[in-house]
Amino acid sequence: METAVIGMVAVLFVITMAITCILCYFSYDSHTQDPERSSRRSFTVATFHQEASLFTGPALQSRPLPRPQNFWTVV
């Protein structure tokens, strides 16, 4: 039983590392590193912003983001 658990953890670790390597490979920006070689397309990871929804409503969207100085004190 312990061997099966260790095996499953090892398999999940290998799968996680493979996905990480694939994402790192495709997120490499060849234009900023070597502008003369553009043989492979690169993509930029999208940044998401919060939009008004039924749960948050538009009132929470107008609050400014806390600055780093008062990040932990904002409630």
Curated annotation (Swiss-Prot):
Name of protein: Small regulatory polypeptide of amino acid response
Expressed in which tissues: Expressed in the skeletal muscle.
Complex formation: Interacts with components of the lysosomal V-ATPase complex. Interacts with ATP6V0A1. Interacts with ATP6V0A2.
InterPro entries, per the entry: SPAR
Keyword terms: Endosome, Lysosome, Membrane, Transmembrane, Transmembrane helix
Consequences of knocking out this gene: No visible phenotype. Mice were born at expected Mendelian ratio with no gross abnormalities.
Regulation: induction: Down-regulated in skeletal muscle upon acute injury.
A cellular component term, taken from the record's GO annotations: lysosomal proton-transporting V-type ATPase complex
Organism (species): Mus musculus (Mouse)
Function field: Negative regulator of amino acid sensing and mTORC1, a signaling complex promoting cell growth in response to growth factors, energy levels and amino acids. Negatively regulates mTORC1 activation by inhibiting recruitment of mTORC1 to lysosomes upon stimulation with amino acids: acts by promoting the formation of a tightly bound supercomplex composed of the lysosomal V-ATPase, Ragulator and Rag GTPases, preventing recruitment of mTORC1. Acts as a regulator of muscle regeneration following injury by regulating mTORC1 activation.
Principal location listed in the UniProt entry: membrane
Membrane-spanning parts: 4-24
Membrane topology: Single-pass membrane protein
